[in-house]
């Protein structure tokens, strides 16, 4: 006999899909623009429909443990108002006006760069639909999608490196330049 636990539904607020099923996934990327691409530093599934602001503290501590680097600034969207992060002066919410310098304003524009990363994770790396069972499956799917995305960036970089190496070792013949 096969029994599957029903997925909890959330009110999505969209006309085409009034209810959403599944869990929230938290994605963390660097605030600065890396040369190799926008890597995913941390991905985790959050169950029970938590408030965004309450998820910030645990996610940042996990991120600091994984990378070994203390985060200096965190740029989040307006859903994180009322967060419980211990260092409130390091969290910058979209649309914030007070204490915003020019460099922070420039970094806040980079916050929008995480949206295409989420889109690629959903469309090309199977984060949009999970085929794994249970809460552990949700967590594993989020981590595996992020790892696949990062691996694709590494493969793209290696492909460019190999192309440059082959062009250096085997230059095109002179007659090919004049065709």
Cite the ranges covered by each PLM segment.
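Generic, well-ordered alpha-helical scaffold segments in large soluble proteins
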Residues: 30, 59-66, 117-120, 124, ...
């Amino acid at each position: 006999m096969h029994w599957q636990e029903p997925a909890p539904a959330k009110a999505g607020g969209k006309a085409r899909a009034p209810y959403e099923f599944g869990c929230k996934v938290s994605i963390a990327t660097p605030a600065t623009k890396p040369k190799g691409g926008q890597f995913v530093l941390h991905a985790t599934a959050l169950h029970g429909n938590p408030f965004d602001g309450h998820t910030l503290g645990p996610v940042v501590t996990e991120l600091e443990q994984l990378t070994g680097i203390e985060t200096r600034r965190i740029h989040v969207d307006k859903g994180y108002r009322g967060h419980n992060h211990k260092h409130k002066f390091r969290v910058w919410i979209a649309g914030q006006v007070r204490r915003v310098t020019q460099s922070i304003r420039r970094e806040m524009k980079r916050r929008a760069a995480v949206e295409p990363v989420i889109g690629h994770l959903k469309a090309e790396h199977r984060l949009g639909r999970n085929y794994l069972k249970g809460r552990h499956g949700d967590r594993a799917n989020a981590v595996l999608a992020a790892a696949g995305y990062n691996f694709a960036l590494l493969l793209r970089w290696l492909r460019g490196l190999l192309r440059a190496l082959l062009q250096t070792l085997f230059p095109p013949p002179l007659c090919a330049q004049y065709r």
